[in-house]
Amino acid sequence: MTSRKIDIYNHVMPTAVLDYMRDVSSAAPGMIKRMTTIPVLYDIEARIRMMEQWPGYEQVISVAIPMESMAGPGDSPALARITNAELRKICDGRPDKFPAWVASLP
């Protein structure tokens, strides 16, 4: 049996979150450009391939941005909902790799 190694607060940037930020945030262009240069932030299959180098390696995921810097009071509740839904999808799809996520608040 392989022992579990759980690493917490690993940053991800789901593409749906990037898309929403593109639509609502004036700070987004620079942040999105930086985020999209690192495939394991937004490409979960690439992340899983990287993780498979270490048997039993799991991640508790969180978003790679502070919500308040990407959306104002009018948009941050929707951004938090989208973010939490996307992180849940990732965890539900691969609970063997992502047993939990850190929820975001507006």
PLM region descriptions:
Residues 1-106:
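Helix-coil boundary/capping segments in enzymes
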